[in-house]
Amino acid sequence: MQVMYALLKPGGTMICSDFHPFTKIADILNLEQPSMSYFSTAVFEGEMAHARFYEDSVRQQMPRCSYRKYTISEIINAVINNKFILKRFDEHPAWDNPDVPGEFTITADR
């Protein structure tokens, strides 16, 4: 969030949209990622984002990445603690199961 705040012009609006941390406890979006405790702070190794959308020959050449999945409160508090003015927080249904959150969007001003 520090980098986004530094890059955004004063008076500008940040729109952050990402997978909902709820996906930590179940692979509800079929992202081929391991499930873990919602509150886990573990770092794990996996494929780059969206690698599964490439052909296997390309996918195998992509470097592995380290991930740490944050809780929704960690994400929202990072927005607030980095001087953004939180304007809106929305949760969106998962693609395959509209009964659970799959993505979120945060809108905040600098």
Where is each model-derived feature located?
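A short hydrophobic/small-residue beta-strand
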Residues: 14-15, 86
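C-terminal lobe and adjacent flexible extensions of AdoMet/dcAdoMet transferase-like proteins
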Residues: 74-110
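SAM-dependent methyltransferase
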Residues: 15-77
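Acidic/proline-rich low-complexity IDRs
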Residues: 6-7, 61, 85
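Bulky hydrophobic/aromatic packing residues
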Residues: 1-4, 67-68, 95
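A short glycine-rich, Lys/Arg-flanked "PGG" loop and its adjoining helix->strand segment in the class I
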Residues: 1-13
